[in-house]
């Protein structure tokens, strides 16, 4: 799985960085968890404040386009981000925690 950053914009009004990216892969579309972990590694960001908002498959290609946000802190993320996006990203973190406990 390869990630290419299309744009990286700082948005000081909403206390975040906004990243648009493309993901190239060989088999099935990667999960949000996999993309999030790869973005954490590529961007050297904290996984607690990184949110993958969208990940859309490009028809007929082994590529997907995505949009992620890196907040300055968790408080800003909790007040600005919608519940559905937080749940989508939080479920992945909870699954990670359960695996780590076992």
From Swiss-Prot:
Source species:
Methanococcus maripaludis (strain C7 / ATCC BAA-1331)
**SUPFAM superfamilies the UniProt entry points to:** Ribosomal proteins S24e, L23 and L15e (SSF54189)
Its cellular-component GO annotations read: ribonucleoprotein complex; ribosome
Q: Which PROSITE patterns match?
A: RIBOSOMAL_S24E (PS00529)
| TM annotation in the entry | none
| A Pfam match | Ribosomal_S24e
Q: Kindly provide the name given to this protein in its UniProt entry.
A: Small ribosomal subunit protein eS24
Q: Which family does it belong to?
A: Belongs to the eukaryotic ribosomal protein eS24 family.
Which molecular-function annotation in GO is an example for this chain? Answer: structural constituent of ribosome
* Gene Ontology biological-process entries: translation
> Keywords, A to Z?
Ribonucleoprotein, Ribosomal protein
Q: Which InterPro entries does UniProt cross-reference here? A: Nucleotide-bd_a/b_plait_sf (IPR012677), Ribosomal_eS24 (IPR001976), Ribosomal_eS24_CS (IPR018098), Ribosomal_uL23/eL15/eS24_sf (IPR012678)
């Amino acid at each position: 799985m390869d990630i290419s950053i299309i744009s990286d914009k700082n948005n000081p009004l909403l206390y975040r960085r906004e990243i648009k990216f493309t993901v190239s892969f060989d088999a099935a579309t990667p999960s949000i968890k996999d993309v999030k972990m790869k973005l954490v590694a590529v961007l050297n960001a904290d996984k607690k404040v990184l949110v993958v908002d969208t990940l859309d498959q490009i028809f007929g290609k082994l590529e997907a386009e995505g949009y992620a946000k890196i907040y300055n802190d968790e408080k800003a993320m909790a007040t600005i981000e919608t519940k559905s996006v937080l749940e989508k990203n939080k479920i992945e973190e909870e699954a990670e925690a359960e695996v780590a406990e076992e």
